[in-house]
């Protein structure tokens, strides 16, 4: 079937996010043909840049459990784990809600003008974090400023990859976002090692210097793709149409529930391991196992999504995460906890990378994909902000017994899976591959 003969539900989105004239690295004017989507070297260089971005940004966030344990036991000893979890939750909240601003900004100014200041703010946030001694200081530096920096880096990257890929969008996004899993493995190990040998301040400063080595080349590799001939250069926003699109609203609610619970194990699994007799080092390594599984999951779900349907795969991933979390009631030995962390990483791997691909698939007007991704992530920010503190409060209320914690996490992920499946049915009730 030719490209022009595809049905709307089969048509993989071609985004028309505009590129300003001032950012004309590549010109699509008829005299300088645009590099091909999916296959050109230029397109895959954007993916490489995305991997380099997500290694220090999302990867560092995936290692927050190491900081959580250190703050509870050392720097902020005496402060409840629920209160400390707000630091990591603020990062997620600002990363998500930042899409309301950064998404439309990307449509107007392109990638470079967001990635460069985002990189500067990222490094400054870590340098300020390195001198923090009190809780409120960490909230401001590691929570708020670092979260804003992540938003400036996350959305231009994921929007640019959506522009450069069509048929292979799933695997392209999976490969790029797998950088966060590789980063999670690296940061989990190196942070704990440095904390043991050089202390908190120089550990965080060293993280800033290492991150800079990844951020600089990514700012060069990631560029906005100009619109193709015939594509709209201006956003045609109709908020009434967006907010009355049933399949989009259902998918957004599903992702809110999924992201409400998905990040909680990344914050608390080391503490869970210590509860059941694992050493501090062994418990911290659970994050490395989880991120290793996440790397496999992101690549695997990207490949599966392009072949079996993106909504099908993301729904299956969310359902699997919920089932695994309920299994924690019976998982109390070191070997079983390690197996859980790896499997959870695999199943949760595609939940971030496939979101934008799903939005693109149900967006007929490709000039507003960036806005719709930003609106959805802004909506999901509520879950990112409150999920871990609520789970921590349940843990404290149960006197460090994990029953309520597990039931909360598992229930909201299962609920998110059900709503996501419903959105898939509304979007394409008669097609198996969607």
From Swiss-Prot:
Q: Where is this region: Disordered?
A: 1-34
Q: What is its main location?
A: membrane
* Gene3D superfamilies with a match to the protein in the record: MFS general substrate transporter like domains (1.20.1250.20)
Molecular function terms from GO: transmembrane transporter activity
Q: Please give the organism.
A: Aspergillus niger (strain ATCC MYA-4892 / CBS 513.88 / FGSC A1513)
Taxonomic path: Eukaryota, Fungi, Dikarya, Ascomycota, Pezizomycotina
Choose any GO biological process term that the UniProt entry carries and state it. secondary metabolic process
The name of this protein is: MFS-type transporter pynF
Q: Which family does it belong to?
A: Belongs to the major facilitator superfamily. Monocarboxylate porter (TC 2.A.1.13) family.
State the annotated membrane topology for this chain.
Answer: Multi-pass membrane protein
What biological function has been recorded for the protein in this entry? MFS-type transporter; part of the gene cluster that mediates the biosynthesis of pyranonigrins, a family of antioxidative compounds. May be involved in the secretion of pyranonigrins.
